[in-house]
Amino acid sequence: MSSCSSLSMDDRVKIGYGSIAGASLSIIGSIGTIILIKIRNKKQEKKLLIQRKQQLSINNLNINSGSSSNIITISNSTTSLSSNNLNIQPPSFPSYSPLPTSISLSNNNNNNKNNNQKTKVSHFIINLSIANLLASIFMITIKLMMIHFNDKFIKVLPSTANHSFNALISVCTIGNGVIGFSFISTFFWTLAISMYIYQQFLSSSTINSNNNNNNINNINNNNNNNINNINNSKNNNSINNFNNSNKSNKIIKMLFYFVCWVIPFVLGSILVSGSRLIELNSDLPWCSIDSNIQLISFYFPLIICLLATTFFTILIKYKFSNDKLACSSSSLINLQSKIIQRLILFLIVILVCWVPSLISFFISFFSKNCKQFLWLEIISSTIQSCQGILNFLSYLSIFKKLKLYFKNLKKKFNNNNSNNSNNSNNNNSNNFNGGGIFYSKGKKVNNQNSNNFYFTFSTFDFDNNQIQEK
């Protein structure tokens, strides 16, 4: 979508093939990301269903055996504390009416609906992958038509032939709009991921703090009314929280859809209106976008999204550093750390893909002769088309695994050169777990959070029930 015409026909062909190569890889990466998320979500749903059935069986067994009087329910189907573990004496009355099975079933159903209706990070990544997929498909189609079907590429539609020159509609001008729409949508969805994760970090800290205070107050109440008060308050709170969160999540979801799809579509339409045909008498006619319109409708939203995503990522990192000192849950710390690592990778991807394009645009924008560098144009066009495949690699944490692999390889090489064979063997056993890049470190591997190398980020739904200590 360059606004200059200083490059030759051969130069534009080279740039076009670079974009086609990068877009082809991005199609593979975008489809792979969507498939992996869908598979992981199915596995998570089956796992949660099994856990709910097991919890329901335990509740029914406790009710039938009469031993449920020693169980204090703290959260819906997720955490239970024994009165013996809390050093609280059981109620002095001989027996009481336990919680009916129907209430347990109702709570399980509410939790299931609540989890399904939560706005999840994996859902945001799917939309980001769809936007990358559309951008790649449009990029390949437009570039191939420009190179091999140029007569149809610049052919003006009959309905617009009698209009002004800048308003001529062709495949070329429409292509500028749809490519711009898709790429702008990727900017907005990347920003949406960082904003949503930051909001979840804040809300999870607040909810956990309130839940802990309420649990302590409820446990310190009169032992005779302790269980009834907790059950009644939690049932009422679960219903109210479900209704409120359901409404708020629907509003948030619709807002994100509007911002990340509708607004980019409007901006893409502006790019179409700002496109014009140039070099009609050359061997490879093409169309360009007015530099001012391109700045306002494309690069200005890009700059805003880059700055905002960086800002929210820094806030999340700062928030995590503060919460880490006060949090005693190692599993929660590991989960939050993985979320931040992948968010940083997504930020790095969008910076790597679009900073060269920004540099190229502003060089031509402020130069008098619309100066362009062929090598910079090829790099920027190729890398920006690779956003989908780079997001896919970030989703798999390939970069971190490669770094760990080469670090361990260096340690292994140093250990082999050491004269102390015992220390060498110990270091090798500590540094390697399976000896390949598709495995985690051998030290302190959390089976619950590191079961599968390929499916990590899709588990970071960060629902309130998931972030509590189990």
From Swiss-Prot:
Residues 1-16, 145-176, 275-295, 364-372 are extracellular. It is found in: Membrane. The chain crosses the membrane at residues 17-37, 124-144, 177-197, 254-274, 296-316, 343-363, 373-393. Belongs to the G-protein coupled receptor 5 family. It is a multi-pass membrane protein. The lineage of its organism: Eukaryota, Amoebozoa, Evosea, Eumycetozoa, Dictyostelia. Residues 38-123, 198-253, 317-342, 394-470 are cytoplasmic. Disulfide bonds join C172-C287. This is Cyclic AMP receptor-like protein D. It comes from the Eukaryota. Receptor for cAMP. The gene is crlD. GO terms for molecular function: G protein-coupled receptor activity. Keywords: Disulfide bond, G-protein coupled receptor, Glycoprotein, Membrane, Receptor, Transducer, Transmembrane, Transmembrane helix. InterPro entries: GPCR_Rhodpsn (IPR000276), GPCR_Rhodpsn_7TM (IPR017452). SUPFAM superfamilies: Family A G protein-coupled receptor-like (SSF81321). Glycans are attached at N162. Its main location: membrane. One of its GO terms (cellular component) is plasma membrane. GO terms for biological process: adenylate cyclase-activating G protein-coupled receptor signaling pathway.
